Amino acid sequence: KDELKQHDYSSDSLEIIHTPDSISMDESPKEAVVNKPNASVLVAASLVSNGKADALVSAGSTGSVVLSAAKHISRIPGVKRTAIATVYPTLNEFKRDDHLALMVDIGANVESSAKELVLFAIMGSTYVANVRGVGSPKSALLNIGEEETKGSEKMQTAYRMLKEVPSLNFSGNIEGKDILRGMADVIVTEGFVGNIVIKTLEGTAMAASHLGKLAFRARFSWKLGLFFLRKGLRRIREVTDYAEYGGAPLLGFEKMVIIAHGRSSAKAVSNAIKLAGKSVRDKVCETMAQKIGELDFQPK
């Protein structure tokens, strides 16, 4: 409250609820959720569950957010495993509606069944259509080859099932070399693979930035070249800055859950809240539930 007194805000639109505990980044999420029922993220999840809040936004540890949401917030009927999604910039070679693509899952689950991958595609496509405003978003299954017969039996089954979902604009398999080209709006994968892909992209961006700094110090001609490229480089930083996008949606609950980066700035948290608000206003979770309810199967 003392901190808020330094800022201009409407007290009618902000309620502060004190919590005696919090879950740190280095704690075991599973143990903390059990031993700290009054931790801030658990209290926030319970407020969403009982209708006193419409969405949950947290910059806490991913595990604690996922487990807190699972403890208090109901899943969409038919969804047994939720999934974390995140947007990432593409080259947009195919001039799609959005230069960003959504990857789902990026770590909520290590493995997923073929039917669960189908649900991830439906939830991801619904999110992109409603939140990003992409018309008929194209979804693709991350695999080791483009052909329908590529990959494990599970991936082949997922491919066949995805083709049969009327609400999906499924384009087939996509290989790792193509995910930055912008061939699809939604990339579906298991969490183990998705997490490695996203962190590899983050590491590549960091390496490119480091190489640019080395070049800037190495030669005057290179420094001059970077000077003329500064506007373009600034634009690249903007589209790769996680603060611009707020956070990663945790898909599969009846209420929207947004997981912000642990190092989120004020701008990132603000954008995460705006993202949650837009999701609520556009009834994203309700639309996901409707589309999943239209399926002829239930996940095992």
Residue map of PLM features:
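Flexible, acidic glycine-rich loops studded with aromatic residues
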Residues: 282
